[in-house]
Amino acid sequence: MVRTTYRQCVRCVMDTSDPDISFDDAGRCNHCCAYEERTSKLTYRGPESQRELDRIIARIKRAGRNSEYDCVLGVSGGVDSCYAAYAAKSLGLRPLAVHMDNGWDSDTAVRNIKNVAARLGIDYQSYVLDWGEFKDLQLSFLKASVPEIETPTDIAIPATLHRVAAENGVKFIISGGNYVTEGILPKAWHYDAKDVRYLNAIQRRFGTRKLSSFPTFGYWSEAYFKLIKGIRYVYLLNYVAYSKAEAVKCLENELGWKNYGGKHHESRITAFVQSYVLPVKFGIDYRRATLSTQICAGQVSREDALEQLLRSPFDSAAIDGDKEYVAKKFEITRGELETILASPARSYRDYPNAQRFLGILYRTYRCVFTPRRAVTS
C-alpha cells in the first residue's frame, strides 16, 4: 500500500520517509519502541557491562597471546573508529589498525588515522583497492539509480578486515559500530550489502570492467571466516559509557584528532551521497536516523534535532564544487553526472538479487546460533 499522508514520530524524528515505519496509538514509531525494548539492553549498563567487557578483553588476550596482534581494528578517521582504537589501547589490547582505502578519503581523515595510530603507538596498515575496478563498480551503482551507491565500500570493508585478520592469525575484529550513534537505521533505506548477486548484476549491466581483484564479502565468505576461521566482531563501544561529544573532546585533546563535518563525512563520496544524492533524489536524510538514535540515547533533545533538520543537509555554496570533484574522480563530465543524478530513482527490486535466499539463510542462522551481544557476525 502506498502511503499518502506524512507523519512523524512524536518521540524521535523518524518519519514516513521510511516506507516501512509504523506508529503505536501514542504516536511513537517502531524504531524508538524497538530501541527501548531491544537496543537499550545492548548498550552500557554500569557494572554489568564492565564485567562483560572484562570477560571479552580476557578472551581476546588469551586467543592472541602467541601472536603479534590480538585483534584487528578497522579505522576510517571518524569519531567512532578512532575512539574504539583509543579504548582498545587503554584496555591493554595489541591491535593492528587497518584502513580500507577506496580513493575517496578526505585529507582530514587520513591525518586523523595517522595521528591516532602514532600517538597510541599501534601499527597501521592501509589496504588500497584497485582504483580502476572500484571506480567502475561504484559508478555502476550510481548509474543504476539505486540508493545503495556505497554498497561497494560497505562490502569491501568487512572483506578487507577479515582477510587481514586471517593473514595475521587474529580471531577478533574490533569495530567502532555502536548502538548509541547507530541504533536506528531503516532497512528500507539500504539493501543488504552482502548480496553479491545484486552487486554482480549491477556491474554486469552498467560496468565496463571485470572485477578481478575487488574484495567481496557475501554469505559464503562470511560463513567461511566465521565458522572455519573462527573470526568474530567485537563492538567495544557498547560496553563503555560512550558519549560522542565526550569522545570528540578526548580525541581532540589527546590524539590530535580534527573534526571533518557530518557523520561519515570522513569520505568525500559518502559526504556527497548522504548529504546530497540521497536526500534530493531518494528523499532519504540519514540525519533523521542519527538524531533519532541520539534522542533515544538521551544525548540530543528532540527540539534540537528538529532545529538541525530545518537546515539543508548540504552546503548550497559548496555543492557545485562537490559535483565537479565527483565528476572528475569518476572521469565523467559534469553533464554526464547531472544526467545520472536526474534519472528516475530505482530500487534493488529492479535488479536480480538474492533477497529471498538470504532471508531463509538468516532465519536459519538465528535459529541455530544464539545471538550474543559481545561477539557478532
Regions from the language model: what does each represent?
Residues M1-C71, A87-S377:
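Nucleotide-activated chemistry modules centered on ATP-dependent adenylation/adenylyltransferase
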